[in-house]
Structure formats: structure tokens, C-alpha cells
């Protein structure tokens, strides 16, 4: 985006709703948490779409209107994000939706590892139920992928984003084939790439199968389903899916046979949704699932889900990261010859948040907003500061990923107890786990981040290199724009590394890796690389 901050229009005020943190962003839209004033316990997600900018990028008001109509028709299932209402003014389209309070599902899955089969079964079954419901409404999603799979406060899956959805069948009428080639290449069915028309319901089935594969092993099976072009997909087709190399060799035979039945390149032999629901691998009880196919033990599920997350900061981890990063560095350097990384990645959310942050310095994270005259801040002794830093950091579940697996269970139980009060704070929901804390001075912190990014081939010339040390010391927030490629998919990854002062009276910073475009697993992999290479900046409880 080329819009300057001074040109950005203010967000419309919504009656009876207070606006909170940004939880999603893009080139012409931003998603924020909203709190009902008359019912403070009720939180919603509010998506703001800038009409002029979206129109300029080829997304018309009419197209957005069609998406909203389809989404409204599909609202009503417990595993689909509900659409409450929407409206518009001369500048913005605003959409009030159900808030998936626990954020991205795939933000909580370790790349290259995945989750255990019981959890994968739980989420796959909920995904199939959601897709079956929208198909019953005559709608095909056509963009099932990790970016569009969220989870609520109880750990249940929520299918989101109907931007590419299509009405494939109206009441009592025959199916209509789709002809436009849309979706994310790793999750697209082969018939989308190769045919003149395809059954969008069966391409949804294929995408569900790829999602299941990723749940089980934490990586995509191929970059795109093009025979003779993609080596991994070609190998899969040549051997009829009967592969013995990693990660296929870690799956048991029953699961592998089921997955191959879902991922049949020939549509006529691929399992339908109805057949999938009746398959023995799917149609059995799950310890996390109640009779309504929803989560019955959120605490146990969250403990299990987070158990594989790990960011190692040992010398060996640094050595392995540097060794594994050489090819990735070349990939990024080559990619950035074709795109301009000389300007910040000014997603809509960054622009809006920058305006707010220019109006006031960071406020304490543990209390209501305070105003200090003449920048005279209250002073605390070192012991008090350490206790207050610990109080802030220890409440964040993201810190568990830096704890060794041996201490994970006891730490998790302790953290869950301390979360009781924290969860009652407004706008603390839907935060990502791709973040760490630091108690280093801002100048040292930014220098370490810059060096880490350079080591994996990411330019910072347009985001922070122009800032002097004096400039940095005056800032409570620093945004580092990111525009790179995913290591496995070779698809664009865009976002922002946001360095925020947690409390204006403490030298404590939260470094958040906020994705605006791309695969959540590959974004987490990027977060891990930068964090490991920034080891000396990471504060661990």
C-alpha cells in the first residue's frame, strides 16, 4: 500500500461496541476485537474493509456483498464462524462476526511434527461436519486451508472466510461445475489445475485430506498438484500413494489407506463426504468429543495441543538453524530481487495501529490506561520491576514453548491456574503464540532482530535501517515489514514483526510476529528461525 498515515480514514464508530486489539490484517482490511458495552463478557470480531482500496485491488463492493450473502446462509453450524451483521458507510464496509477466541489452529501446531492422531481425528471430524453443512446449503468453500481454520475458547474448530465460496446448486436443481482456478496451490485438487470444469464439492474433499495430512505431520505433501511439474506430487501419483519415505512412513497402515482414499487424483474414485463420515477411521468415538461432536474438556485438549510446541535456544539449535538456513537465505535474496522490500509492509492494521500509537505512548499492560504529564513516569526499584515483569510474562501461554518438555506439564498446570484472572481482561483473546518477550534496551533489541533477519536473507532497508539510535529510544513501538517466501510451499509470506513496550514504566518489550498473508505453519517456522537466531534477546521466565 502506498497510502500515507495522514490519508487513512478513521474507522467508523459502532453503537454499543468498544473496539480493542487488532487480531487480523491485510492490504485492504483489518480485523479487531469488539466488546459489547452492555454485556462486557460478550466479545465479537469486527472486520473493516476499506472500500476504495479494495476496489482498486479488484475486489468490488458487489463481490464482497455476494460473499456476505453466502456466509450468512452458512451461519448456524457450531464449527463455522457465525456472521452476525454487516453495514457500510462511504468509506468502510464493516462486518461483525463470531470471535474465534483462541485464534489460528495452525499457530499451535509444530512445523515438521504435527499433532497426535487423536487430536487430528477430532479436528478433521469437525472440519468434515462443517464442510458437509455448507454443502447441504448448496455452497462449496473452495479455499479450505490452514489460514481459514480457527478455534474458539473451548478448542472447537471454526471454518472461516467465504471469499472464494460459490453456490454450486440451488434448490432442486442440478450441480453447476466450477471453472475458475482458485485456491492455494498446496491445497488445490488436481482437477482444478488440469480440467475445464470441476465439481467444487469434491475439490473441498481433497482440500480436507491435505489439511489432515498437515495436521498429522506439520508439513504440506507437495507445493502443487501438477503431475510432471511437482516432484512430490508426481511421485505420489506414480506409486499410487504407497510411499515409504518420510513423513508417510510414520503413519500407520489404517490411516495411510484412509488418507489415500481421500487424496485420489481421479475424482471418480475419491471418497465423498458421506463415505468419509462413515469410514471406520472417522466414525469412532474421540476422548475429547461429546455427543454433539464438540469439545468436552477444553483444558485437557489445550494441554495436549500445546505439548509439541518447542523453540529450543541451545547452541545446537542455533547451529542447526544456521546450517538449515543457507538455501532459505538464497531463496529469500532471489525473491527480493523481484519484489520491493524497501518499503514497510504497510498492511491496513499497521497503519491504523500506528496512528493510535502516535497519539499515546505504551500503557501498562496490567491495568487501565494511565496518562502521565510531561512524560514523568512513576519510578520503581529493581526488585519491584522484576516482580512486575514476571507477573506480565508468566500470564502468557506463549512462554511455554521455551520451556523444556520435561518441565512442560507442571509449568502448564501452573500457568493455567494463573490464567484465571487474565482471561477476564477484555481484548486479551485471539493472541498468537508467535511471540517472545525481551528486557533488553530497544536499541540492542532491534539490532539483534536486524542481524537475525539478515542471516536468513530478509532485507530491513525500508523498515528499520533508517532509524537512528536516538529515534529508536523515542519509540514505544517499532514495526518491521516482512515480505518473503515460505520455505516449503514457495508461496508469499507477508506480515509484521511488532516490537511493543508492554508497560511505559518498564523496560519490557513484546515481540509479536503478526502474519497478514501465507501459511500459518510456515510463518511459525519463520518465527522460530528468527527467535533462535535472536537468542540473547529472549526473556525466559
Spans of model-derived segments:
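Protein kinase glycine-rich loop
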Residues: 20-27, 31
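Conserved N-lobe beta3->alphaC-helix segment of eukaryotic protein kinase catalytic domains
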Residues: 43, 48-74
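Activation-segment/catalytic-loop signature of the eukaryotic protein kinase fold
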Residues: 86
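Conserved short submotifs of the Hanks-type protein kinase catalytic core
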Residues: 90-104, 108
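Activation segment signature within eukaryotic-like protein kinase domains
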Residues: 123-124
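Terminal C-lobe "cap" of eukaryotic-type protein kinase domains
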Residues: 265-289
Amino acid at each position: 500500500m502506498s497510502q500515507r498515515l495522514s490519508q487513512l480514514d478513521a474507522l467508523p464508530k459502532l453503537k454499543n461496541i468498544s473496539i480493542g486489539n487488532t487480531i487480523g490484517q491485510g492490504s485492504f482490511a483489518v480485523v479487531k476485537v469488539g466488546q459489547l458495552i452492555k454485556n462486557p463478557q460478550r466479545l465479537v470480531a469486527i472486520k473493516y474493509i476499506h472500500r476504495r482500496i479494495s476496489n482498486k485491488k479488484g475486489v468490488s463492493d458487489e463481490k464482497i456483498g455476494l460473499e456476505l450473502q453466502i456466509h450468512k446462509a452458512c451461519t448456524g453450524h457450531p464449527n463455522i464462524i457465525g456472521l452476525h451483521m454487516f453495514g457500510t458507510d462511504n468509506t468502510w464496509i464493516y462486518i461483525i462476526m463470531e470471535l474465534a477466541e483462541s485464534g489460528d489452529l495452525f499457530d499451535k501446531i509444530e512445523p515438521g511434527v504435527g499433532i497426535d492422531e487423536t487430536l487430528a481425528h477430532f479436528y478433521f471430524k469437525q472440519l468434515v461436519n462443517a464442510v458437509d453443512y455448507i454443502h447441504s446449503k448448496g455452497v462449496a468453500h473452495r479455499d479450505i486451508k490452514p489460514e481459514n481454520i480457527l478455534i474458539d475458547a473451548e478448542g472447537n474448530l471454526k471454518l472461516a472466510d467465504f471469499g472464494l465460496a460459490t453456490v454450486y446448486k440451488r434448490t432442486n436443481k442440478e450441480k453447476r461445475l466450477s471453472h475458475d482456478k482458485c485456491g492455494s496451490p498446496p491445497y488445490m485438487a488436481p482437477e482444478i489445475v488440469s480440467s475445464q470444469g470441476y465439481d467444487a464439492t469434491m475439490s473441498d474433499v481433497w482440500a480436507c485430506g491435505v489439511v489432515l495430512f498437515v495436521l498429522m505431520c506439520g508439513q504440506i505433501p507437495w507445493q502443487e498438484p501438477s503431475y510432471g511439474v511437482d516432484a512430490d506430487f508426481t511421485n505420489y501419483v506414480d506409486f499410487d500413494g504407497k510411499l515409504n519415505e518420510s513423513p508417510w512412513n510414520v503413519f500407520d497402515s489404517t490411516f495411510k489407506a484412509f488418507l489415500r482414499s481421500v487424496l485420489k487424483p481421479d475424482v471418480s474414485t475419491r471418497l465423498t463426504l458421506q463415505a468419509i463420515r462413515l469410514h471406520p477411521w472417522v466414525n469412532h468415538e474421540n476422548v475429547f468429543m461429546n455427543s454433539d461432536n464438540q469439545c468436552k474438556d477444553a483444558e485437557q485438549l489445550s494441554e495436549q495441543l500445546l505439548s509439541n510446541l518447542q523453540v529450543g535456544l541451545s547452541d545446537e539449535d542455533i547451529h542447526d538453524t544456521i546450517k538449515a538456513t543457507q538455501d532459505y537465505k538464497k531463496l529469500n535474496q532471489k525473491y527480493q530481487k523481484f519484489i520491493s522490500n524497501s518499503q514497510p509492509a504497510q498492511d491496513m492494521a499497521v497503519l491504523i495501529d500506528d496512528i493510535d500509537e502516535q497519539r499515546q505512548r505504551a500503557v501498562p499492560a496490567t491495568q487501565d490506561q494511565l496518562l502521565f504529564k510531561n512524560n514523568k513516569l512513576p519510578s520503581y526499584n529493581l526488585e519491584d520491576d522484576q516482580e512486575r515483569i514476571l507477573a506480565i510474562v508468566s500470564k502468557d501461554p506463549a512462554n511455554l514453548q521455551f520451556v523444556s518438555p520435561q518441565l512442560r506439564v507442571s509449568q502448564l498446570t501452573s500457568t493455567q491456574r494463573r490464567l484465571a484472572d487474565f482471561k477476564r481482561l477484555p481484548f486479551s483473546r485471539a493472541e498468537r503464540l508467535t511471540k517472545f518477550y525481551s528486557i533488553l534496551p530497544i536499541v540492542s533489541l532491534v539490532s539483534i532482530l536486524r542481524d537475525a533477519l539478515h542471516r536468513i536473507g530478509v532485507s530491513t532497508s525500508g523498515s528499520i535501517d533508517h532509524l537512528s539510535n536516538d529515534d529508536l529510544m523515542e519509540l514505544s513501538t517499532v514495526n518491521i515489514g516482512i515480505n518473503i517466501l515460505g520455505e516449503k510451499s514457495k508461496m508469499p509470506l507477508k506480515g509484521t514483526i511488532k516490537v511493543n513496550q508492554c508497560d511505559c514504566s518498564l523496560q519490557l518489550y513484546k515481540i509479536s510476529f503478526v502474519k497478514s498473508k501465507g501459511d500459518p505453519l510456515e510463518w511459525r517456522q519463520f518465527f522460530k528461525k528468527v527467535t533462535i537466531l535472536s537468542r540473547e534477546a529472549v526473556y525466559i521466565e
